[in-house]
Amino acid sequence: MSWLSRLNPRGPGTRTGRHAAPSSPCTADPETCLMVFENHWRQVSGVLKQRESSVGGFADDLTAVRNHTDQMLCLLAEERPAGGDIDSPAMGPILEMVVAENILEELVQWHVCRGLDPDSQLELLKLFEMLIGQSHQPLLLHSAVLQPLLSLLGACVDPQMGCPPALESSLVLLLNQVCVSMAKETAVLELLFRCGSVQQGPTNLLIFSLLVPFIHRDGALGQQARDALLLVMATSASNHAVARHITENSYFCPVLATGLSGLYSSLPRKIEVRGDDWHALRREDWIGVSSLVLFMNSLEFCNAVVQVAHPLVRCQLLDYLHNGFLVPVMGPALHKSSVDEMIASTAYLDLFLRCITETSLLKTFLRFILLHHHDNDTILDTLLTRISSNSRLCMVSLSLFKTLLSLNCEDLMLQLVLRYLLPCTHVMLSQRRAVRETDLYGKSADKFLSLIPECCRITSAPSGERDEEPAFWGKVLGSPTSESPVHPRPSTPSRLALFIRQQSSGGQANPSSSGSENAPSSPRGSVSSPLSPDSPMHQLSDFSEGETGYLEYLRDARKGIELCSWGCRDWSAPYDGENPSPNSAPLPPPPPTSNPSLSMVQEHFSVMDPTQQRAAVVAAARAEWSSSDRDSGEWDVTISKNCISLTPRSKKRSLLPSSIPLQSSSSASVSTEITGASETVYQHSRSTPHPALYNGMGQVEFTDSVDERMEAKKVKRDSDVNSGMVETGMNGSMGPVDYNDFHVGSTLKSSQVQLKPHLQHHTSVPSSTQECLPTESHRLSPVLGLTESSAASRGSESVERLIEELLERAPSEPLSGDSKCQGISIEAFHQELRELEERVRERRVSSRSSEESSRESRTAPLPSLTDEDCLPVETEQRSSETKPDSSTTGVFSPARPLGQPLAQPYTGPFITVLFSKLENMMQNSLYVNILLTGVVFQLACYPQPLLRSFLLNANMVFQPSVKSLIQVLGTVKNRIEVFAAAHEDFPAMLRKARRFLVARGKLDWSDSAMGVPSLRRSDSLIKSRKPSLGDLILRHTNSPTRARHAAQLALAHVRDGGQSLHSALFRGSAASGASGLEKQAEALRVKNAVYCAVIFSEFLKELAALAQEHAVALPFPPSQGTEE
């Protein structure tokens, strides 16, 4: 039979491996193949009929049956259809014989009756896998093939023990082939469902049930099982009966969700990295950690199932993921007490959100973040607290928020920012129309660029400095093209290729080169770096680091705005100050008084007792300020439970006219540290000799004198004005103090009473309304709550002492700082405070119903008063708003639960924390500032006029208690200039910092011999390399070789971790006579300040570019079908 060798050239007793390629098409005619098949079957059937009389020789019979069966199934697999229609071809003659005589059923039953040993099971599984995988005919459409297959599968899998380990790979491969065949022929699914019900009962779809246990397996086995299940999901997407079976009679969704929980518990609980710029898990970070790879594979499978599955399956899976994984596992993980575990869980959540692509699954994660409460706090509130934490946790949290902002989710943005801006209380009533205005003339951009500190506008380096420059600062090869801009391109990267957020398109920049060596810098001359290697990044420094490629920033801004606008095109409202209407927009709901975590009590601020908290605050303050200039200023952000308290320490000027003279140096700025745990307050540091007043909650429960709780910090004052200026910090602005406006509020918690003295002022007061000044343009405040007698007594003493000290130190003449306040006398002020004291005493004996009415009054919309509203004051509380003196300490709006509607304008905890971090840029590390400015950049890309005008419109007039981004940046500018004036070598340090950042951006970290070692997994995730700031600092792999080599040499000391970043750039800047610890602290402070100057200048140019691009951006039309 020479034809048989041509047909199947295999020796007796041997078989082609299951991974072998299919044999060549049959060279024999169908009739010959059928004759051979019949011959093999006659020999096999003879053995099968003798099975009952046979006593011995079972091994010989088994061998003969295997050999003949092998030949038969190979002939069947290589047979082609006999012809007929393309859609329904006729069966070949061999297949007709198999179906007519039920050959496969007899073979399987003979093996089952003889007893299926593992070897027999394995051989049969391989034979069926070969038959189904290589057949040219749809075999599974015939019950004569499908029924024996199901019988074999049922016999191979023990109901109690499951599949034997030796059979797992063959079983999964066979099931995968069945699912592939099912995907090609959807009718196979119906047959499987019907045959499975008959064979295994109505509660078991055998193919599906056998695959479920392998969902979370690692390696190729698990991947094949997931691929097969995904094919089942896709095929059953339109089959309601199968979908019902999966949801009602299988454990697919529970196994998938709870399996994720089990896999998450095996993830490393600590992420150890050597680089100080690490902030997010990238693929190269986790690809070597088996437990994380396994989890990510399962999560990606969930994402795929949600994408293709039937709606019934999708809904059940999402519900199980929320209630079986996110709530019981991710929730507690995000609230671990260990900082390392918080960092890991936050990084994991960020990674999950970046890997998920399906909208429904993203919604489930966002629902968990926005709505789920853990220990009475939402996950979002918890994550907000992390921004003000230590550097590493802050960086990971900022990275997470950048990921959240990139989702362009309306619900998320409403919760984070828009709900606080919707009532438009942050702008003056007459300015609401300006929310929708477009800045066509670039005034806002000009304002941002004007904030670049003069000390950062370096046009040339001294010759001594140039000699130290490495060779790669030479000009880029080639001459300028005809498209080169008139002014030179920059020599430091755009949005610093240095620091740009997730930009990997380094080669997309305009390749035009720079201009002449001595080209003049632009009017806004500042420094940046180009985005691409062929930009003037490599130019010689003799043309200076003078002017950044502003066009690069414009391109980045346009891209960011377009992506964001596209993502927001189906939002329910434009958020333009009119839709939704500010009058009908719901204010954030008040916290339930029954929830202890939402009431203004000690537990909001700390779990420590007053003594412990004071000790902790003082210790933290001393440790923090030991390495920095105490006069440089900082906001102490304390976020606990649902309250965010920001205690300003700043004494630098904010961005306000400098023509207002300051007070003499004998004045002191007072920063208060309250003893009680609940006494974290927003405080006024006064430039006048008045005691500190709280624009938040002043505590009634004082047990020591006020003087014992104050730390006086002296600052320079000018001596020609005694104007009593007060700086309101994050949500404040500048103006003279109006001592006629003062109100005290209280809230009740058990026997504890807390007062809320507010001292605020407006920018101007019309002289025609001086008599009714206390009521003009003021927001009505909540009435006082009830108190118990003991607490009321303490409250009375506190109020009386506060009033007496205020009266003793108040000026006896009208304030000289404001010509419009000349009609105000100290007698009127005295009288009003006495009336206020009487009202406080009357409220102590009011009934319980008065307390309930006060709560209702807090939730009611608060009217904006006009000039005609100047009537006698009949409310229990009033507030006046003051503009800050730029030399005094900033004060925030009152500490309050997250989401509480306010009597005073409040821009929300997210904006508050971001602005506080921004104002504290001088103390932040380089990488914190990079991530922080990246988040603000992402926020400013949103096209909604409410948000755009709040961040980028420098011409908007906000309420005096609301501090704008321009003011925050102005404060940073002043601090940088003060720092630069105090350090003669600042220009040299600035150039070195820029050079380092450019070199770092150009370095390909995988080039050197100190390559990236593989990740190791012990009990923690160890990343033994210094990453490139997670794509924020670009890797220019196509940079010239000599440039890369020079960069590697410049950073070799950083790569091995032996020296700090500062030691290479700022050697010798610390005081030589200081101790080692003091030198390190001073070096850290100097390093942060110099890098802050570089980041700050580039950030201003980014904001200017955003402001210009918003003016010309066009909205995208809504899509035809809104996504889920």
Swiss-Prot record:
Source organism? Danio rerio
Q: Where is the composition biased (Basic and acidic residues)?
A: 838-858, 875-884
Compositionally biased residues, Low complexity: 509-532
Q: From which domain of life does this come?
A: Eukaryota
Key word Cytoplasm present in the record?
no
Q: Please list where the region (Disordered) is annotated.
A: 1-25, 461-542, 577-599, 713-732, 838-900
Pfam families per record: DUF5917, KELAA, RAI16-like
Which gene is the coding source of this polypeptide chain?
Answer: fhip1b
**InterPro entries reported in the protein's UniProt record:** FHIP, FHIP_C, FHIP_KELAA_motif
On subunit structure and binding partners, the annotation says: Component of the FTS/Hook/FHIP complex (FHF complex), composed of AKTIP/FTS, FHIP1B, and one or more members of the Hook family of proteins HOOK1, HOOK2, and HOOK3. The FHF complex associates with the homotypic vesicular sorting complex (the HOPS complex).
The answer to whether keyword Transport applies is: yes
Keyword annotations = Protein transport, Transport
**One GO CC term, this protein:** FHF complex
Q: What family does the entry list?
A: Belongs to the FHIP family.
UniProt feature coiled coil, ranges = none
Q: What is this protein called?
A: FHF complex subunit HOOK-interacting protein 1B
Name one process (GO BP) from the record. early endosome to late endosome transport
The record describes the protein's role as: Component of the FTS/Hook/FHIP complex (FHF complex). The FHF complex may function to promote vesicle trafficking and/or fusion via the homotypic vesicular protein sorting complex (the HOPS complex). FHF complex promotes the distribution of AP-4 complex to the perinuclear area of the cell.
Bias category Pro residues: which stretches?
583-594
